[in-house]
Amino acid sequence: MINMRKTHPLLKIINHSFIDLPAPSNISAWWNFGSLLGVCLIIQILTGLFLAMHYTSDTLTAFSSVAHICRDVNYGWLLRNLHANGASMFFMCLFLHVGRGIYYGSYLYKETWNIGVILLLTVMAMAFVGYVLPWGQMSFWGATVITNLLSAIPYIGTTLAEWIWGGFAVDKATLTRFFAFHFILPFIIMALAIVHLLFLHETGSNNPSGINPDSDKIPFHPYYTIKDALGFMFLLLILLLLALFSPDLLGDPDNFSPANPLNTPPHIKPEWYFLFAYAILRSIPNKLGGVLALLASILILLIIPLLHTANQRSMMFRPVSQTLFWILTANLMTLTWIGGQPVEQPFIIIGQLASMLYFTLILVLMLFAGLFENYMLKPKW
């Protein structure tokens, strides 16, 4: 009798995606982050679902409903801590996943890469609307500052901002719709992730060497299911350490105060995973210019495949590109640090230099590094 997993219409799809899938034999731990992101998404959906059962999206009761979840709901404190820190783990995995894609040239699978960039933008939107829900000081002022950026768009900006707010400022209508968006977006992300996988399985996985691996493939199960399971254990260990020992480590103390439109916090900043983009936004002293730079900092990923000039796909054997890649990584860490600092010297100038270097590295230096490496590899006799 033929194995049911190979004949059943539904099981057959799962079999081709996770069991009998031919995978390169040499993919490293950097290829674990895709499955880790899937686990993060499932954790966030499950904890979020239970939180939504007790949360009320009303300006008068939102803050106290979160306090009620932590104090009165069975394991509510754990659900809230897992959900809040799960978002941080999600973004940590996302950044490492994108970094892996850039380092090993995975962006040359253009459809997979483009869906990935759309996924990144959608996850950022989901995290932003989610951060507003507890209705603390930083939730309210973060929402006010970021949605206000829409008013920088010529002609339609003010109308657009008021349309998003559902009034003349961030208020009850804004909170209610943000809760609705935050509930629906994870399912949209799940659908996009399936499309992302669909495109990936059209071409097969890339590998560290960047060489076509078709001559040496192994089945996904048991080799990579075991490898992924090890990754899951590490992820859950770090998440539980965060959620149980220092749940407020990555949060902002201002969010323990209920939202007050009459009292502005001394320093408005988003969660750590948005700080690099926030630093780029602030480094341009013009509202519209800042908004465009903010968008460009993410959308620049879409043109990375067009900037690939090297004869080799991966950076594994390209030391000049490797050096620039790690400078870019250090630069992003610098931007993250600057985004959390007050707007005063020397932070302003450091932020401006780091923002300029970010775009220069990607648009100019990476491009010429590939051409230079091609030239150096040419036989000189």
From Swiss-Prot:
Query: Which GO biological process entries does UniProt record here?
Result: mitochondrial electron transport, ubiquinol to cytochrome c
Note the topology in the membrane. Answer: Multi-pass membrane protein
Residues at which heme b b562 binds: 83, 182
Cofactors (names): heme b
Recite the UniProt keywords alphabetically: Electron transport, Heme, Iron, Membrane, Metal-binding, Mitochondrion, Mitochondrion inner membrane, Respiratory chain, Transmembrane, Transmembrane helix, Transport, Ubiquinone
Q: Where does heme b b566 bind?
A: 97, 196
User: Any idea where this protein resides?
Assistant: Mitochondrion inner membrane
Q: Which SUPFAM superfamilies match?
A: a domain/subunit of cytochrome bc1 complex (Ubiquinol-cytochrome c reductase) (SSF81648), Transmembrane di-heme cytochromes (SSF81342)
One GO cellular component from the entry? Answer: mitochondrial inner membrane
Highest taxon in the source lineage = Eukaryota
Which N-terminal stretch is annotated as signal sequence? none
Q: Where would you find the membrane-spanning parts of this chain?
A: 33-53, 77-98, 113-133, 178-198, 226-246, 288-308, 320-340, 347-367
Binding-site residues, a ubiquinone: 201
MF GO annotations:
metal ion binding; ubiquinol-cytochrome-c reductase activity
**How many cofactor units bind, and how?**
Binds 2 heme b groups non-covalently.
PROSITE patterns, per the entry: CYTB_CTER, CYTB_NTER
Which PANTHER family does this entry report, sorted A to Z? Answer: CYTOCHROME B
Q: Which family does it belong to?
A: Belongs to the cytochrome b family.
The remark listed among the other comments is: Heme 1 (or BL or b562) is low-potential and absorbs at about 562 nm, and heme 2 (or BH or b566) is high-potential and absorbs at about 566 nm.
Function comment: Component of the ubiquinol-cytochrome c reductase complex (complex III or cytochrome b-c1 complex) that is part of the mitochondrial respiratory chain. The b-c1 complex mediates electron transfer from ubiquinol to cytochrome c. Contributes to the generation of a proton gradient across the mitochondrial membrane that is then used for ATP synthesis.
Task: Provide the assembly information.
Answer: The cytochrome bc1 complex contains 11 subunits: 3 respiratory subunits (MT-CYB, CYC1 and UQCRFS1), 2 core proteins (UQCRC1 and UQCRC2) and 6 low-molecular weight proteins (UQCRH/QCR6, UQCRB/QCR7, UQCRQ/QCR8, UQCR10/QCR9, UQCR11/QCR10 and a cleavage product of UQCRFS1). This cytochrome bc1 complex then forms a dimer.
Q: What is this protein called?
A: Cytochrome b
According to its UniProt entry, this protein's organism is: Dasyurus spartacus (Bronze quoll)
Recorded name of the encoding gene: MT-CYB
